[in-house]
């Protein structure tokens, strides 16, 4: 966004090169999970990767916002470092979806849950835009980034802090997930099947 373009000064070529490196690390992360972490607790892995993703991001963001380090290579380093935990997060989320599907409707369940999950990002972005629109000075005005006043830096930092707070708060719902495939199968056998539950989750 604005921080990346105006304060970190990220150029398109460097951005694309780091994206390629990030994709390679994402693939490496998928292999690591397959090789070493398949039997680990899903809740534990999602908690660990969720915390790591935020904790890795924070220093790069705040050091750039407060003009401690403003360098495109420094800022892009974060996009590379998060790829391994992001891969683990992705794999575990996929495992949960696969295990929750009943035999014969795996494709339907996978499609429904992945579509619902994919809707989360644009909906969250829309809500975030409305919420961040309340901040003053405006976070969407490029002139504020060019002026780069201490007051505006604090405003930008506050918006990021709010984002991190929501991200950490979402981890509080992890207890709803099964711990591993055995628990997922047990829940499917023993828990009551109610359409209202599915509707509530989708909404």
Regions found by a protein language model. Give the residues of each.
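Hydrophobic alpha-helical segments of secondary membrane carriers
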Residues: 17-18, 49, 78, 94, ...
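A membrane-interface helix-boundary motif in multi-pass transporters
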Residues: 43-44, 130-166, 184-201
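Intracellular juxtamembrane helix-capping segments at the cytosolic ends
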Residues: 88-102, 106-108
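Transmembrane alpha-helices of Major Facilitator/SLC transporters
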Residues: 15-40, 49-61, 121-124
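Loop-to-transmembrane helix entry
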Residues: 1-25, 46, 73-74, 155
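C-terminal transmembrane helical hairpin of 12-TM major facilitator-type secondary transporters
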Residues: 44-92
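A gly/Pro-rich, aromatic-decorated transmembrane alpha-helix motif that marks the paired
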Residues: 58-62, 119-138
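Loop-to-transmembrane helix entry/capping segments in MFS-fold secondary transporters
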Residues: 12-13, 101-116, 193-194
